[in-house]
């Protein structure tokens, strides 16, 4: 299992965003320490295996965070580059730190103009999410591709007894919604009946 180290201040954001963008979240009451990284994937058929959830949990609060009722809605995370992550504030868009980040090799490397401060770091994050696993971590941050693309995704947290955050979770795909919707026809998208036939296509 991968781990990252977080300080009291944490940025949860699409890595393409600078400080002027509103649809990011700055957390200032995170319990400092080492966090376990959990990346869940969901098989979406023709869409392939997509990342459905990114979770980081303080190593001292694994049991507490295992209780689903302990998670509290916090905010929504905007995504415009098909990826998002959880980063120690000191490392976010830090080009100097990026020099020490190793990313998987790509057959067709992602190339950006490097016009703005933070672009060297951003390039490394893109290389993580474009690689086969669609995510990656460095000492003080983790980034993943965002389910099936851009949008707004819920951020949930867990607090300890002193109101410090000890668990952080971004949900890209909600499995419970898929279960409620039932099977869909591959031709028209209509719901499949109990007899296995589509009421629209089979009339």
Language-model features: locations:
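Intrinsically disordered, low-complexity acidic regions enriched in Pro/Ser/Thr
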Residues: 1-180
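Extracellular/surface recognition and adhesion modules
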Residues: 186-188
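Cys/His-rich microdomains that often coordinate metals
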Residues: 192
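Cysteine-rich micro-motifs
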Residues: 195-203
């Amino acid at each position: 299992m991968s781990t990252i180290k977080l300080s009291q201040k944490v940025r949860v954001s699409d890595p393409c965003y600078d400080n002027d963008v509103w649809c990011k979240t700055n957390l200032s009451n995170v319990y400092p320490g080492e966090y376990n990284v959990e990346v869940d994937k969901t098989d979406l058929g023709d869409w392939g295996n997509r990342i459905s959830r990114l979770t980081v949990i303080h190593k001292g609060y694994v049991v507490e965070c295992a209780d689903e009722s302990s998670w509290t809605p916090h905010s929504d995370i905007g995504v415009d580059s098909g990826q998002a992550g959880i980063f120690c504030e000191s490392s976010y868009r830090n080009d100097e730190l990026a020099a020490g980040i190793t990313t998987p090799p790509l057959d067709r490397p992602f190339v950006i103009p490097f016009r703005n401060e933070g672009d060297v770091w951003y390039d490394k994050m893109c290389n993580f999410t474009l690689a086969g696993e669609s995510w990656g971590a460095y000492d003080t941050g983790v980034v993943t591709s965002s389910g099936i693309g851009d949008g707004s995704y819920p951020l949930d947290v867990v607090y300890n007894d002193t109101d410090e955050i000890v668990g952080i979770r971004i949900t890209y795909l909600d499995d419970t919604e898929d279960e409620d919707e039932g099977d869909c026809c591959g031709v028209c998208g209509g719901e499949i009946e109990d007899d296995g036939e589509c009421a629209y296509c089979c009339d």
